[in-house]
Curated annotation (Swiss-Prot):
EC number(s) on file: 5.1.1.3
The entry's keywords: Cell shape, Cell wall biogenesis/degradation, Isomerase, Peptidoglycan synthesis
InterPro entries: Asp/Glu/hydantoin_racemase (IPR015942), Asp/Glu_race (IPR001920), Asp/Glu_racemase_AS_1 (IPR018187), Glu_race (IPR004391)
The encoding gene: murI
Molecular-function GO term, any one: glutamate racemase activity
Family indicated by similarity: Belongs to the aspartate/glutamate racemases family.
UniProt superkingdom: Bacteria
Active-site residues, Swiss-Prot/TrEMBL: C75, C186
Chain positions recorded as substrate binding sites: D12, S13, Y44, G45, N76, T77, T187, H188
Protein name: Glutamate racemase
Example GO BP: cell wall organization
Catalytic function, reaction form: L-glutamate = D-glutamate
Main function: Provides the (R)-glutamate required for cell wall biosynthesis.
EC category: isomerase
Amino acid sequence: MSVKNNPIGVIDSGVGGISVLKEAVKQLPYENFIYYGDSKNAPYGIKSVDEVRNLTFNVVEKLLKLNIKALVVACNTATSAAIDELREKYKNIPVIGIEPALKPAVELKRRGKIIIMATPMTLSEVKFKNLMEKYEKDSEIVKLPCPGLVELIEDGIVEGEKMQEYLRNKFKDYEKDDIAAFVLGCTHYPFVKKEIASIARDVPIIDGSQGTVMQLKRKLDKYDILNIGSEKGKIKIMNSLKDDKILDLSHRLLDL
């Protein structure tokens, strides 16, 4: 059996990476995917780098036993903490990470602040500092740590008064400012895009899933393992919580 038929592994600290999986299924309809959410240990964003690195490697080892042909780390925090080490250790498969989509936000050339919403760990890591340094000459970039937001989404709260209250509280310091764009620096956050848009009217909201999947496509092509069959691929969703509720939420968010 050809390696091309082997699944692509997509991992995250919980249900957030489903936003990347969704984009991947759209762009790569003939690929098979295995998604693994580590909700038992979520959120990663408030843990130490070493903890996140260890958790990430544990999940990857599980997926390698299922013969994945490529790995997508669909978690900004895990990418910040472990992507270089993963690429170093697993040289035989393409390993794709995700980072906040600052470049497209800067390229909009809109007046005002670019607000990066992300977990505390993503914003404090060297990888993000380097990314910021690349663009802060051109734009005013504001870091907005969002502790607690991942937990709300993991509980299935993606709309309604509780979410609105959380977001209004986060944005209150910027009500009078010109905002050029919001950048969603965590794969959980696209699921509350509608709620963000309802508060931050007419401000572009950008996430990195499209760019990540385009990079995945390029790598599959480069390794000559792109599946261009005619049969729609299969999707398997796994979660460390082993709880039907979290699996139901995952399928609901995938919304196929």
